[in-house]
């Protein structure tokens, strides 16, 4: 057993209001520069819908994630090394700019320079940020399907409608929607790492954050196809790939990510999980896709177990990280209460950004008296959002974990409503779903109140264990350019503008 730690995230979809604050703040901090105008490290999608980029969940089209071969071994869906090499100069599974959107701005200067007395109202026409040319029509945007914007024929192409009679949901009275904030999953078994020909992508040992080395990246873009969540973007200015960095400078300082800090709905939770690195391959190679969720749970370790603590210390896990894992809200939601579920575990990447399924539209329908009940709780299988749809999204089609999570949330609400409104303690609903009163009270505190100190339990990094970064900063500078690879050629395979790098190598004493 080899114990490692990972900073994970849980998003409570039951409270997401779709305000896009997380997307805007992330955009302003990380991708408000030339070359990545179209890139959104964090975006909020409305489901049902095809998402951003279009149809990103269709792995028959994009070939992302892993597949299990007949011999039980894993292989990138793109193919083996020889197949990857054969596609290196022409990747047919790469999303194009039209699958995202052509970034644009408006000719606001035209409003200022329009002559007085003009017979027509001056307008600010859209202009492409890539070509600089005027655009006749804006065809798409990052939230083009926001709030079910668009006809149902396009929304019905959502892959999560598989095995569902989706025709009935085209009728107004059966319409449903939910918000799905998405960011890089920082997987335990990342396919992007395996498909990068340059070996530029790596997973940090201390916190599990997946990063791209901008010095090593050569812009092959195989990682974009390899990532099943399509959360890696190509910077056409620098010729490099970029992705969500989980705000690691903030994480190292013990602070939450920008998207978590600015979330007005308090839906995001950050915490440490301890896991067995030796069990990753066995879990990801599980034959039945519906068992992948449980196999990933088996990878996580109990931070309160004395044997786990002893082994973690031997494996170099600091005590502060172990203590943070014992108070982790992510561990409580994923392991103890089993409310949080992984996004598309069938991709076999073992994602580490999990989601609590939405309950609000279901509960409102139950309050209206339109639904039957199953014992104390409403019959969740007959409620507004199809359980099978949520299962296709979060548990590879297995409805049992979805039903358990929804019933436990309903039971907690039933218990607290009886306590606060009726002034009595009614534990029948809790007993029905296997919860204690103490667990229900704690769930209420974390889900409803969601205090800052409960949502974010992030240990600061141990800088005494890190190598001094000043020589690297002095020699190269922390830039998004070509880095210090020492190239002096002007040839560019992808016909994009490159930033000339200055070859400066710092001389430092060897680290003891």
Curated annotation (Swiss-Prot):
Cellular localisation: Cell membrane
Binding positions ([4Fe-4S] cluster 2): 26, 244, 247, 259
Domain 4Fe-4S ferredoxin-type, chain residue ranges per copy: 7-35, 175-206, 208-237
Pfam families xref list: Fer4_11, Nitr_red_bet_C
Record's function text: The nitrate reductase enzyme complex allows S.flexneri to use nitrate as an electron acceptor during anaerobic growth. The beta chain is an electron transfer unit containing four cysteine clusters involved in the formation of iron-sulfur centers. Electrons are transferred from the gamma chain to the molybdenum cofactor of the alpha subunit.
Subunit description: Dimer of heterotrimers each composed of an alpha, a beta and a gamma chain. Alpha and beta are catalytic chains; gamma chains are involved in binding the enzyme complex to the cytoplasmic membrane.
Name of this chain's protein: Respiratory nitrate reductase 1 beta chain
GN (gene name): narH
